[in-house]
Amino acid sequence: MTDLTSKERSRLKGIAMNLDPIFQLGKESLTPEFTKAIDEALEKRELIKINVLKNCDGDKNALAETLAERTHAKVVQVIGRKIVLFRYQKDPKKRKIEL
């Protein structure tokens, strides 16, 4: 997947505004199980929001980049304690979001 353009990123941010976080990143940080769960959620939903808890150690931007790298996703936005990730579904017929 190529980098997102500013127009694509803007559209995804608009969609993400109405999403509730479906994961919470806490003290345990980026475990293999957490990464696998994120990967599975991205396959089903394409766009997800993650809540970073106060007890989570580390820089939110670095965590977002690491998570995106491990799941082959793109970081749409890191704002406050929220991370938004995007990845197209592998099957083009099942894609829900077209950019």
Regions found by a protein language model. Give the residues of each.
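Positively charged, polar, low-complexity stretches
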Residues: 1-99
